[in-house]
A protein has these predicted regions:
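Short coil/turn segments at alpha/beta junctions that flank glycine-rich nucleotide-binding fingerprints
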Residues: 22-26, 77, 139
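Short secondary-structure transition hinges
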Residues: 90-128
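Amphipathic, non-transmembrane alpha-helical scaffold segments
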Residues: 5, 55, 59, 63, ...
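Basic, helix-initiating cap at the start of DNA-binding domains
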Residues: 1-23, 27-36, 53
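Hydrophobic alpha-helical connector segments
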Residues: 57, 61, 68-97, 151-155
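Short hydrophobic/aromatic patch on the recognition helix
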Residues: 38-48
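Hydrophobic/aromatic-rich alpha-helical bundle segments in the mid-to-C-terminal region
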Residues: 137-183, 193-195
């Protein structure tokens, strides 16, 4: 692909992504994407079949970037519980960028073919995350007798807990709140020695 074509494709993706994250997929048009990207519809059609194709490319890129950040966090030379805290914070930042409209569209099957695509992305991330947990079991960072699928479920629930604004208001800062969540994950509610 020529440099100009790559640049044009990137402009379309950036414009489509900005509109999609703000308004959802259903409420935007190819015309709006073209105007924001500064391209004609003919140029758009040279790169993408329709707005759903743009949405899929934006989502794929978003998931790839998220996973690269997860790998970067997990490769840091810091204690494992700090890695998990950064992971939860990253997940929160990721979901804050999504409008309610896009979240609803991706969870429901309101756009033909999108639910299947999103399920494929989700399964890919789940498989990678479980493989990562197994690696940390082998290195001794996670108990070997706990199922990785259980850990994944608990992390998802803790991420949801971290979105609770009423609960967050009980703490002086978001960092203190996340620390409490992490300490609960690692040490439970019983008093005792902490690492």
């Amino acid at each position: 692909m020529k440099a100009k074509d790559v640049e044009t494709r990137e402009r379309i993706l950036a414009a489509g992504g900005a509109l999609m994250w703000k308004h959802g997929i259903s409420r935007i048009t190819v015309g709006e994407i073209c105007r924001k990207a500064g391209v004609s519809k003919m140029t758009f059609n040279k790169h993408f079949e329709n707005k759903v194709a743009v949405a899929k490319a934006v989502l794929q890129r978003s998931v790839d970037e998220l996973w690269n950040k997860v790998v970067e966090i997990m490769d840091r030379p810091i204690p494992f519980h700090d890695k998990v805290g950064l992971y939860i914070q990253l997940r929160l930042e990721q979901t804050e960028a999504w409008s309610q409209e896009i979240a609803r569209e991706l969870l429901e099957d309101s756009i033909p073919g999108m639910a299947e695509f999103v399920n494929g992305l989700r399964q890919s991330i789940l498989d990678k995350t479980i493989a990562m947990f197994r690696h940390f079991q082998e290195t001794g960072d996670i108990r070997r007798d706990i199922k990785p699928e259980f850990l994944l479920s608990m992390l998802n629930r803790l991420t949801e807990t971290a979105k609770d604004r009423d609960l967050m208001a009980l703490y002086p800062s978001f960092q203190t709140f996340v620390k409490e969540i992490m300490e609960f994950l690692f040490y439970g509610m019983l008093p005792g020695a902490r690492a």
